[in-house]
A protein has these predicted regions:
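Phosphate-backbone recognition surface of nucleic-acid-processing proteins
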Residues: 123-127, 131, 140-152
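Generic structural signal for hydrophobic residues
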Residues: 56, 122, 137-138
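N-terminal polyanion-binding entry modules of DNA glycosylases/AP lyases
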Residues: 1-82
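Short amphipathic alpha-helical surface patches that mediate protein-protein
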Residues: 54-55, 97, 143-146
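Non-catalytic, well-ordered alpha-helical scaffold segments
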Residues: 29-33, 54, 86-93, 139
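Alpha-helical ds-nucleic-acid-binding substructure associated with the helix-hairpin-helix region
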Residues: 59-129
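Short helix-capping/linker segments at secondary-structure and domain boundaries
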Residues: 42-48, 99-107, 146-150
Length: 152
């Protein structure tokens, strides 16, 4: 069964073969929110992230690209409900700025992602363009947005 939220996925429990890719986001805002979730989740339990997600969404300006791209990490860290990890918060701001650049170049993030032929190439590009994204995070993100790193 396809899923919307990453924590619904058995992939998160290392059972990759039993989980279909997630649903493709409808908006760039959703693409950024899912990337942010994958980054914020690293090192935390899914249960904790699931419980805290409404607070994180509010603290991080609903992951609206323009607002987050113009925020400062210091200001976000002071907001109620924000995760208190300065490196992750700085990555959220930098990644929103990168989304802005990609949208200026390609119109939408989805259109940009479609220009990358293979899932493996997409994984590499995500690691190069975005902060706090390593191989596992890139692979998991692609899975969550409906694309497999194993696509030809």
């Amino acid at each position: 069964m396809s899923h919307r939220a990453p924590w619904e996925c058995t992939f998160a429990k290392e059972e990759r073969s039993r989980c279909l890719p997630g649903k493709k986001p409808r908006t760039d805002h959703e693409y950024l929110e899912i990337l942010s979730l994958c980054i914020l989740q690293a090192g935390l339990s899914w249960a904790s992230v699931r419980r805290s997600w409404p607070r994180y969404r509010t603290a991080f300006l609903n992951f609206e690209i323009a607002k987050l791209a113009h925020a400062t990490p210091a200001a976000l860290l002071r907001r109620p409900g924000a995760l208190r990890n300065p490196k992750k918060v700085a990555a959220l701001v930098a990644n929103a700025q990168e989304f802005d650049r990609i949208r200026a170049e390609h119109g939408t993030f989805a259109r940009y992602l479609r220009t990358v032929r293979s899932g493996k190439d997409a994984c590499t590009i995500l690691q190069q363009r975005f902060r706090h994204v390593g191989p596992y995070t890139a692979e998991f993100y692609l899975h969550c947005v409906g694309r497999s790193v194993y696509d030809p």
